[in-house]
């Protein structure tokens, strides 16, 4: 096997793990290869807020020494490096949530998912960029830098997790972790051509995930293949007593489902096309690729029927009341008193705790975070709570009931992931409502706690990736992995290879041994 950098990094995570098991490559060599790509790509991609190269190499060396004798017994993905969204705490590595208010904060503990990655022998390449506190759909709201889409560096990678998606798409990392509150894994997945998964709410521990909206947040995988996401989800999933919302049962058989799906036999599967998610407001190229992918599902034996979720049209409005309300509550802890940024009042202003908090939050939070705190505080205020927050929760219940009724008819639901392909920087920054609409197809699964996944459906007429979304019943994540893997295989047959064959990667040119 060639050790050339470009050859190594273009392997899937599963292929990299297999190469380690065979003795063709070491974990250190994989880390070194990805660090080379990061060095070459970051000037144009800017996916990482912090590259932890020394830490990754140390972890890789420890893994290589420990696994030298019995490689055959290694768990899947062992030794494969990973990137982490900077919304997940990492012991000894600065964690900022892309906010100035947490600049310089080094956590004294690991999130549960990080503990599991370390136990699996997966070196951490670094922390990836995001919209501040995961609040945004373009990664333009980071306090530090703007991440660029590898398919067109003048366009956004989606958000909030554009850093993890771009890092995986640009071959800076074979796999990554993100968080998904209203589509923050899946929408960037659609815009960058990656596979993005939001597990069932409670299926992956949130302990150590910086809270944005606690009833919606979920950690999940970002990868280039469906199988890689399944492998990673089985590693990070399972019950955690430190998370009160954690589901008692262990991970579902997602890897087996993905491998079964790759056989491309969907006979007996009923697929529901959500009629409310499509048509007006969806880019023609998105609709075209989605329709072609639906035909592929039919060709493999799936029965595709149209289903109605009549209250799904209210999901955007309900979400943008519930989410800011929880943001307002969760972000109240950033007050300059305990950790993070502290800004004292200027001379002439009383040096009180209240003034210190006000000046700290004014300096530490960006415009979008402040906007959502204000919206949430208003929705929770006396006299408005029932009219706004209470009503939104009632709508949420109706959406959950819509999904339950739909799943009485079908096994899995489908829709486009995002109404458009990647848009140019600045195009929607002055219009928050236009930005919020990017998540119209992803938000319903978060409100209902359902597992959902986006996979590449091809390139639109503008040459940019389109996402195809699967939604499965709660605690049945494996149900979406089978058709997703089948569709991935069928589409790649038609493309004569993975979507990555069409991606121009000048940062890989000239990278050798």
Curated annotation (Swiss-Prot):
Enzymatic class: ligase
Record's subunit section: Heterotrimer of A, B and C subunits.
E.C. designation(s): 6.3.5.7
Protein function: Allows the formation of correctly charged Gln-tRNA(Gln) through the transamidation of misacylated Glu-tRNA(Gln) in organisms which lack glutaminyl-tRNA synthetase. The reaction takes place in the presence of glutamine and ATP through an activated gamma-phospho-Glu-tRNA(Gln).
Gene Ontology biological-process annotations: translation
A GO cellular component annotation in the UniProt record: glutamyl-tRNA(Gln) amidotransferase complex
UniProt superkingdom: Bacteria
Family affiliation: Belongs to the amidase family. GatA subfamily.
Enzyme active site: 85, 160, 184
Catalytic activity, as annotated: L-glutamyl-tRNA(Gln) + L-glutamine + ATP + H2O = L-glutaminyl-tRNA(Gln) + L-glutamate + ADP + phosphate + H(+)
Name assigned to this protein: Glutamyl-tRNA(Gln) amidotransferase subunit A
Keywords on record: ATP-binding, Ligase, Nucleotide-binding, Protein biosynthesis
Gene Ontology molecular function terms on file: ATP binding; glutaminyl-tRNA synthase (glutamine-hydrolyzing) activity
Nucleotide-binding as UniProt keyword: yes
């Amino acid at each position: 096997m060639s050790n050339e950098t470009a050859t190594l990094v273009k392997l899937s995570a599963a292929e990299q793990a297999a190469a380690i098991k065979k003795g063709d490559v070491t974990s250190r060599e994989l880390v070194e290869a990805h660090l080379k790509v990061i060095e070459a790509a970051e000037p144009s991609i800017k996916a990482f807020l912090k590259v932890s190269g020394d830490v990754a190499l140390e972890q890789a060396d420890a893994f290589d020494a420990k696994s030298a004798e019995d490689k055959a017994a290694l768990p899947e993905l062992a030794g494969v490096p990973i990137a982490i969204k900077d919304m997940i705490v990492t012991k000894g590595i600065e964690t900022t949530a892309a906010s100035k208010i947490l600049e310089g904060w080094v956590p004294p503990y690991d999130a549960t998912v990080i503990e599991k990655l370390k136990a699996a022998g997966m070196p951490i390449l670094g922390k990836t960029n995001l919209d501040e506190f995961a609040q945004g759909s373009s990664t333009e709201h980071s306090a530090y830098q703007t991440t660029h889409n590898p398919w067109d560096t003048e366009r956004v990678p989606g958000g909030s997790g554009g850093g993890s998606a771009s890092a995986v798409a640009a071959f800076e990392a074979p796999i990554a972790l993100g968080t998904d509150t209203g589509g923050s894994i899946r929408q960037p997945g659609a815009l960058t051509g990656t596979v993005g998964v939001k597990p069932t709410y409670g299926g992956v521990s949130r302990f150590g995930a910086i809270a944005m909206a606690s009833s919606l947040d979920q950690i999940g995988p970002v990868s280039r293949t469906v199988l890689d996401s399944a492998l990673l989800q089985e590693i990070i999933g399972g019950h955690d007593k430190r998370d009160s919302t954690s589901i008692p049962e262990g991970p579902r058989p997602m890897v087996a489902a993905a491998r079964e799906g790759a056989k491309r036999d969907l006979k007996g599967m009923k697929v529901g096309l959500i009629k409310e998610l499509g048509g007006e407001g969806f880019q023609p190229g998105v609709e075209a690729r989605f329709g072609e992918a639906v035909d592929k599902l039919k060709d493999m034996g799936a029965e595709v029927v149209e289903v109605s979720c009549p209250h799904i049209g209210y999901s955007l409005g309900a979400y943008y009341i519930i989410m800011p309300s929880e943001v307002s509550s969760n972000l109240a802890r950033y007050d300059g008193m305990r950790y993070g940024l502290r800004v004292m009042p200027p001379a002439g202003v009383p040096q009180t705790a209240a003034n210190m908090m006000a000046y700290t939050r004014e300096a530490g939070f960006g415009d979008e975070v402040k906007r959502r705190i204000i919206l949430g505080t208003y929705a929770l205020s006396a006299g408005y709570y029932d009219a706004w927050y209470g009503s939104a929760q009632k709508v949420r219940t109706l959406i959950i009931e819509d999904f339950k009724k739909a799943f009485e008819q079908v096994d899995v639901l489908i829709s486009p992931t995002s109404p458009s392909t990647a848009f140019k920087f600045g195009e929607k920054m002055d219009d928050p409502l236009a930005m919020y609409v990017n998540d119209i197809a992803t938000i319903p699964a978060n409100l209902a706690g359902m597992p959902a996944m986006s996979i590449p459906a091809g390139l639109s007429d503008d040459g940019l990736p389109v996402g195809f979304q699967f939604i499965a019943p709660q605690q049945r994540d494996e149900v979406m992995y089978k058709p997703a893997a089948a569709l991935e295989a069928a589409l790649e047959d038609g493309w004569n290879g993975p979507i990555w064959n069409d991606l121009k990667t000048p940062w890989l040119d000239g990278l050798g041994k």
